[in-house]
């Protein structure tokens, strides 16, 4: 995103060029489209919508030039607003419709699908009123989606979600947190079969999925980097073993309250790190070391784990931290894991030994 300071410099340059070219602005409609869009980049989305109503010239300029819009500020009548705006803003690539209270209905999502065919990033979180009809509409009209947030959407089925994946095959980021009824093993099988570019998936609180679903996901989405299985209470070590073996680029794994997880899962993660060290060395040569290896792991409330198994993971992946301010290895509720420590503690101990405090 271009900074506000850089945009202001561009505006000043535009004004200077207009002076040199003798451009006269006597009415609002005379403002050049390029200048108008630079001005609108400095204001909030509500003002952009108002600007599109000033005159037909501004409406057309905004319609063709606006690629990102958020209506999250709209606390009521969002559905009507979307119905009004969707036919006008046909070049949108990012649309944020996050709600505090559910407002959106199927007809608004259908309008988006009918008009916004270039959409790549869509946030429909907490749209608990939308049903299967919305997902079928998106599958028909928004096949370029790479990022989709459906968290908190509780009124559609796994059949509709599976159908969506067959048409939105470019998805890289998918948030299904809390979509309890829609996320089943069949859903994960469909995602694995159709969305092999997927890199981030949130399945938090989707308590109906089992190892079968996660294994299908692991085999079908080898580029997976972030996976949240928070409170997926049915999964066992088999899921983690499959992820460790198949998803070698995994960076973040959430296993909060997955109480069937044991040491076997931890050792499989550690072994995958050792086995894939050649990938890490390849990244080092490219100057991308920070991008390789597990960097975030949440095993809170996984009470079957022992210190030795978790320490093996921590030793294998030095980006996992237990030290203050850098908690990327989260172990809340696991009192028996208090002895697990990251490399920073050993380094601090060595420093203290080499440079002891002077006597007073």
UniProtKB/Swiss-Prot annotation:
Pfam families: F-box, LRR_6
Domain of life from the UniProt record: Eukaryota
GO biological process: heat acclimation; negative regulation of lateral root development; proteolysis involved in protein catabolic process
Transmembrane segments: none
LRR repeats: 77-99, 101-126, 127-152, 153-178, 180-205, 206-231, 232-257, 258-301, 302-333
Keywords on record: Leucine-rich repeat, Repeat
F-box domain mapped to chain residues: 25-76
CDD domains, per database record: F-box_AtSKP2-like (cd22161)
InterPro entries named in the record: F-box-like_dom_sf, F-box_dom, Leu-rich_rpt, Leu-rich_rpt_Cys-con_subtyp, LRR_dom_sf
Role summary: Component of SCF(SKP2B) E3 ubiquitin ligase complexes, which mediate the ubiquitination and subsequent proteasomal degradation of the cyclin-dependent kinase inhibitor KRP1. Does not interact with auxin.
PANTHER family: F-BOX PROTEIN SKP2A, PARTNER OF PAIRED, ISOFORM B-RELATED
Protein name per its UniProtKB record: F-box protein SKP2B
Organism: Arabidopsis thaliana (Mouse-ear cress)
Gene: SKP2B
């Amino acid at each position: 995103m271009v900074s506000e300071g850089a945009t202001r410099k561009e505006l000043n340059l535009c004004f200077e060029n207009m002076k040199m070219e003798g451009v006269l602005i006597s009415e609002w409609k005379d403002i050049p489209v390029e200048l108008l869009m630079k001005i609108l980049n400095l204001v909030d989305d509500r003002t952009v919508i108002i600007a599109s109503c000033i005159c037909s010239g501004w409406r057309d300029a905004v319609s063709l030039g606006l690629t990102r819009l958020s209506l999250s500020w709209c606390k009521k009548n969002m559905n009507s607003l979307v119905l009004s705006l969707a036919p006008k803003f046909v070049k949108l690539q990012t649309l944020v419709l996050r709600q505090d209270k559910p407002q959106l209905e199927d007809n608004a999502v259908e309008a988006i699908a009918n008009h916004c065919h270039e959409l790549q990033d869509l946030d429909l979180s907490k749209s608990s009123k939308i049903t299967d009809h919305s997902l079928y509409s998106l599958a028909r009209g928004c096949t370029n989606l790479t990022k989709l947030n459906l968290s908190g959407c509780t009124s559609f089925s796994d059949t509709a979600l599976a159908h969506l994946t067959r048409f939105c095959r470019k998805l890289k980021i998918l948030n299904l947190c809390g979509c309890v009824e829609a996320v089943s093993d069949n859903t994960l099988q469909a995602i694995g079969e159709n969305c092999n570019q997927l890199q981030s998936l949130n399945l938090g609180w989707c308590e109906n999925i089992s190892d079968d679903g996660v294994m299908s996901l692991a085999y079908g989405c080898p580029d997976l980097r972030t996976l949240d299985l928070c409170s997926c209470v049915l999964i066992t070590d088999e899921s983690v073993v499959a992820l460790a073996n198949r998803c070698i680029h995994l960076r973040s794994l959430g296993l909060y309250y997955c109480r069937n997880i044991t040491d076997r899962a931890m050792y499989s993660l550690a072994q995958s790190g050792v086995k894939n060290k050649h990938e890490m060395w390849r990244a080092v040569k490219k100057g991308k070391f920070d991008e390789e290896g597990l960097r975030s792991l949440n095993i809170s409330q996984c009470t079957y784990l022992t210190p030795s198994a978790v320490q093996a993971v921590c030793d294998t992946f030095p980006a996992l931290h237990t030290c203050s301010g850098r908690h990327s290895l989260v172990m809340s509720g696991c009192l028996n894991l208090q002895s697990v420590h990251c490399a920073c503690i050993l380094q601090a101990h060595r420093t203290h030994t080499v440079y002891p405090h002077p006597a007073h």
